[in-house]
A protein has these predicted regions:
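Pyridoxal 5′-phosphate
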Residues: 1-380
Length: 380
């Protein structure tokens, strides 16, 4: 069993940071990588042509281990919105309907909305209302049919942590010939995601949450369906002759194979890339399954103590131990409760009406106990 990894971070000892879904803290060795990278800018003569490509390739290798694909199916971006723009700019129109779920994160939602409007596709947003997580998942499955062009959704709902059965959803998409596009930002790095097994056609992830990377870096997987697509920019770095610096004005029009064409320009990002690479290496060192187990170990006592007191959580099969919401009684004002937590140095997020809690390996039982006691203090 993985032990608490708090010594690897510089978190304030007096803070109970249960908010990795907001932003992960920087690893100590990530700090060192950033310092070293910044200082290297003093002497640019040390940069060789291969320096512009090596670190990006290492990032692809590490990320491909996490989501179980080939490194050349990975592209690097500055943001998820950049990744989604590449995805939806290359989505073929073959049907009349697109599907998403309610309250998706704006970057992805606006991308599919724009694509649907431009192509005169009906965008069906599947609401939950009072449905259980199980019935909401079933509603999604039942809505996917031969008229469906694309299904876009998160693997974990970013506002309340509801787990979607993306394996079943991906299988249904494949059976009817629909694209399956997934925002993996709130799951990849904290739970096992296998893009091949789940029949995912494109997966886009921000780097600064569960991947322990920096802000302004994101990663994406593109299946073979996108191998011949057109990127949203024409970076010289994405051409097959990019490493031949003396021949760049031969203007080789051929893109790199597979997802390489979708990389953002200036892909190397010499200052931020070392932080991203360090975070991915650390995840692979810990092991995603071990991270899942550790989060479950912390979440289980919380459920055991709070459920008998009337606090509601998702049912077992749809509960994520790394990201979930507290179903507090109606008489508790969530905004005031969030302020109460802040005053106790317990940091969570308020998303809509949800008190969102997100656990990771830098948390310990004391963090959980403090949250439990804070909840008990406001119950009647």
């Amino acid at each position: 069993m993985l032990k608490c990894q708090k010594p690897l971070f510089s978190l304030d000892e007096n803070v109970h940071y249960l908010n990795c879904a907001y932003k992960s803290p920087l690893l100590k060795n990530g700090e060192e990588m950033a310092k070293k990278a910044l200082l290297s800018e003093r002497n640019p003569f040390n940069l060789k042509p291969h320096s512009y490509f090596e670190i990006s390739d290492k990032i692809r290798i590490e990320f491909s281990k996490i989501i179980h694909c080939h490194k050349n199916e990975i592209a690097l971006f500055p943001s998820t919105s950049y990744g989604f723009a590449n995805v939806f700019n290359n989505l073929k129109v073959t049907r009349v309907k697109a599907i998403t779920v309610e309250n998706e994160f704006p970057s992805g939602f606006f991308s599919i909305k724009k694509w649907s409007l431009e192509n005169e596709i009906m965008l069906q947003t599947l609401t939950r209302n009072e449905l259980s997580a199980k019935d909401w998942n079933q509603k999604i499955l039942d809505s996917i049919d031969e008229k469906t062009n694309v299904v876009f959704m998160s693997s974990v709902h970013w506002m309340d942590g509801t787990k979607f059965d993306i394996k079943k959803i991906g299988k249904k998409c494949k059976s009817v010939g629909a694209y399956f596009i997934v925002d993996g930002t709130q799951s990849v790095g904290a739970m096992n995601i296998n893009v091949k097994e789940f029949n995912i056609d494109a997966l886009i992830c921000a780097g600064y949450k569960w991947l322990f990377g920096p802000y302004s870096m994101a990663l994406g997987y593109f299946s073979s369906k996108f191998n011949n697509g057109t990127p949203i920019e024409e970076s010289w770095m994405n051409r097959t002759n990019a490493q031949e610096f003396s021949n760049l004005t031969d203007y080789d029009s051929k893109y790199k194979t597979m997802a390489g064409r979708y990389n953002v320009g200036e892909t190397a990002n010499f200052v931020l890339s070392p932080i991203m690479l360090n975070g991915l290496k650390q995840l692979n060192n810990w092991g995603i399954s071990n991270i899942e187990s550790y989060c479950k170990k912390l979440a289980d006592p919380l459920l055991k103590q709070l459920i008998p007191l009337g606090i509601k959580f998702e049912e077992k099969n749809y509960f994520n131990p790394h990201l979930f919401s507290l179903g507090l009684p109606d008489y508790i004002d969530n905004i005031n409760f969030k302020k109460t937590l802040d005053n106790k140095n317990i940091y969570v997020s308020l998303r809509g009406k949800n008190i969102r809690v997100s656990i990771n390996v830098f948390n310990d039982q004391n963090d959980i106990n403090m949250l439990i006691e804070a909840v008990k203090s406001v119950l009647k």
